[in-house]
Regions:
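Metal-dependent active-site segment of extracytoplasmic phospho-/sulfohydrolases and closely related
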Residues: 139, 321-360, 405-409
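Histidine-centered active-site microenvironments of extracellular/periplasmic hydrolases
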Residues: 159, 338-339, 345-385, 422, ...
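C-terminal, low-complexity/hydrophilic appendages and adjacent surface loops
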Residues: 444-450
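Active-site-proximal cap/lid insertion segments
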Residues: 231-236, 288-336, 361-370, 378, ...
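A short beta-strand-to-alpha-helix junction
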Residues: 182, 202-209, 308-320, 362-368, ...
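Short, P/G- and charge-enriched loop/turn segments at secondary-structure junctions
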Residues: 126-129, 357-362, 392-393
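Active-site-proximal alpha/beta segments of enzymes that process anionic O-linked groups
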Residues: 92-140, 145-303, 396, 400-402, ...
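Transmembrane and membrane-interface helices of multi-pass
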Residues: 1-103
Length: 450
């Protein structure tokens, strides 16, 4: 219990709240460099006092002196009493704030294992699909920790998105103003976004087909291109889904040991220039984006924003660089004759103005504020006037990113009759955009409007 207790209490002194299982999962999946970057911006006096007090207590209840000899009887008895009381107290208080989140991790581990084991069963469910898609290249791009309220294209006063802002009135681009994340950490959010599971259906994650599985069943060639680390402490649904792709290109070789990059995010577009055309292709790009530590993930030439809040400035620099990344991606895609659609969203936001990042334990609405926009080729626009018309009228409709699965399949012309939910398909005539029905934190919190 020593290390788990230390982690739990450290989280408490960092945030003022005990962690949830999802927070501990994120900690276990982090690396030394990322953790150091986080702590450098969040050190506090309680945390600094926590560590020496904790280890001092461990020393006092240890059974031996520094010379290896047993302490005298008067000192030994209280130590033995503490050693006996501690495990008994934990056993009698199974649901205490120190042990409960660690017990919750076991449930997540089982859910992840079940998801991996049931892949074949899910594929069998995909034999009854209908396909109306035209040949071509369909792209899904996933941002990281990007808060739409820090993007000039959505009204933020700083010039963080000069390229996207210049495209706001381009008929090939549609920007959606009321998009939110279903969770405020990457793995949980993408576990829903990239599968048929969402907050509004009763499906279990293990039974939910993934976007890659559905695309392959429809005859698409699938490609996963990522600048995030490939492995963490264990496989998650995101890494399992990625491993199902016909092609995988991992541009970050550090394998969970560092937050450094081999290349910046703009290099991912190079993979598309080398990719041969096929009849139908789905490409999923997973960027490092605005992941902490912010200064690590863009060239120094993009350190352009300066004020009396360097933490906020560094974050806005990542938004500015990512605007260039998406400009380069668009130039690459528009040069390809097979390009059809691009859908971009972020996994979650960041409560950057409050210096709270994205922690469900200390949830604030800004952690859910994300961008959503789509780009279409001339060919696609002319071939799908009804679908485009629906999207145009929905640019101010509410949407959560656990509906990516429904949205992307609709853009690709893939229909799963046994799983289709028209009320969750923003391209559908029957999309339900009633604001009050939308939730976050896996259905436990109502959405707070931007």
């Amino acid at each position: 219990m020593t290390l788990p207790a230390l982690v739990t209490w450290s989280c408490y002194f960092l945030t003022g709240s005990f962690p949830q299982p999802e927070t501990l999962l994120a900690i276990l999946q982090t690396n030394v460099s990322e953790a150091a970057g986080y702590l450098s911006g969040h050190l506090s006096l309680p945390l600094l006092l926590c560590l020496p007090l904790y280890f001092g207590a461990l020393f006092l209840i240890s059974g031996k002196s520094s010379t290896g000899e047993l302490f005298s009887r008067p000192s030994l008895l209280p130590r033995l009493a503490l050693l006996l009381v501690a495990p008994v107290s934990l056993a009698l208080s199974y649901s205490n704030p120190v042990t409960t989140p660690w017990i919750g991790i076991k449930d997540y581990m089982k859910a992840y294992a079940d998801f991996e084991q049931k892949s074949k069963e899910r594929t069998i469910r995909l034999t009854n699909l209908t396909i109306s898609s035209a040949p071509g290249l369909y792209v899904l791009a996933i941002g990281e920790s990007e808060n739409s309220e820090h993007m000039n294209v959505y009204g933020y006063p700083r010039p963080t998105t000069p390229w996207l802002s210049s495209r706001r009135n381009d008929p090939h681009f549609l920007f959606f103003d009321d998009a939110y994340s279903c969770y405020v950490q990457t793995v949980p959010a993408l576990s829903y976004a990239l599968t048929a599971k969402n907050q509004y259906n009763g499906m279990s994650l293990s039974d939910a087909p993934s976007l890659i599985e559905a695309a392959k069943a429809a005859g698409f060639h699938t490609v996963w291109i990522s600048n995030q680390v490939r492995f963490s402490a264990w496989d998650t649904p995101t890494t399992i889904i990625a491993s199902e792709a016909d092609e995988q290109h991992w541009r970050n070789s550090h394998l969970g040991t560092t937050a450094d990059l081999d290349v910046y995010d703009d290099a991912l577009a190079e993979e598309l220039t080398r990719m041969k055309s096929s009849e139908k292709t789905l490409v999923i790009l997973h960027y490092m984006g605005s992941h902490m530590p912010y200064a690590y993930h863009h060239p120094k030439s993009y350190e352009k924003i300066h004020s009396d809040d360097p933490y906020r400035d560094q974050y806005d620099d990542t938004i500015l660089f990512h605007d260039y990344v998406m400009e380069k991606l668009y130039e690459t895609l528009s040069a390809r004759p097979d390009f059809q659609t691009l859908l971009y969203f972020s996994d979650h936001g960041e409560a950057i103005d409050l210096h709270l990042d994205h922690n469900p334990t200390i949830y604030v609405p800004e952690m859910t504020y994300i961008p959503l926009y789509m780009v279409f080729s001339d060919t696609y626009l002319s071939a799908h006037p009804k679908l485009i018309g629906n999207l145009v009228t929905r640019q101010k409709s509410r949407w959560t990113n656990d509906l990516v699965f429904d949205t992307q399949l609709a853009l690709m012309g893939i229909r799963l009759p046994d799983l289709y939910e028209p009320e969750n398909d923003i391209t559908s005539d029957h999309y339900d955009d009633t604001p009050d029905r939308f939730k976050t934190l896996f259905g436990t919190r109502a959405i707070t409007a931007k």
